[in-house]
């Protein structure tokens, strides 16, 4: 993803802003994807009943969505005031959170952000 976006406005030119973008990209891989995407995979593709899904995934996903909601409470994007790769990486699984058992209406700032990013990227709405 970084290679494909090199030289575009999706990667901030400013070193500090670029570091913030990387911080969110790393966080997505370690704290977000590992809960929301894994739960979605187990529920949607493996068709596991709730009782067979790793119990730690639900609170971990709720924690990730809560942190995102707090961060987005007073901003429209994760880094700066415009779309970056951080938003693209985070929207990928967040927009499918309902399939993982998370109701995004419980995180209104995240819900509004998903709608905004889907619109900007021309994606079919999932929420």
Regions found by a protein language model. Give the residues of each.
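Domain-level recognition of soluble alpha/beta enzyme cores
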Residues: 21, 108-110
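Structural helix-adjacent loops and short alpha-helical linkers that scaffold large soluble proteins
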Residues: 9, 55-56, 101-108
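Alpha-helix C-capping/helix-to-loop hinge sites
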Residues: 4-8, 48, 74-75, 95-100
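GST-like domain detector, emphasizing the conserved glutathione-binding G-site
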Residues: 1-55, 69
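GST superfamily/GST-like fold recognition
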Residues: 36-40, 78-103, 116-117
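Amphipathic alpha-helical packing segments from all-alpha helical-bundle domains
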Residues: 54-72
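Surface-exposed helix-capping loop/turn segments at secondary-structure junctions
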Residues: 7, 70-82, 121-127
């Amino acid at each position: 993803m970084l290679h494909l976006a090199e030289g575009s406005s999706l990667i901030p030119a400013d070193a500090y802003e670029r570091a913030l973008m990387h911080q969110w990209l790393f966080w997505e891989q370690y704290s977000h994807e590992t809960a929301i995407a894994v739960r979605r995979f187990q529920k949607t593709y493996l068709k596991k009943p709730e009782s067979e899904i790793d119990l730690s995934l639900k609170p971990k996903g709720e924690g990730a969505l809560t942190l995102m909601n707090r961060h987005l409470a007073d901003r429209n994007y994760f880094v700066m005031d415009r779309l970056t790769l951080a938003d693209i990486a985070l929207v990928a699984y967040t927009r499918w959170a309902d399939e993982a058992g998370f109701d995004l209406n419980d995180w209104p700032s995240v819900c509004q952000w998903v709608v905004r990013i889907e619109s900007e990227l021309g994606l079919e709405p999932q929420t």
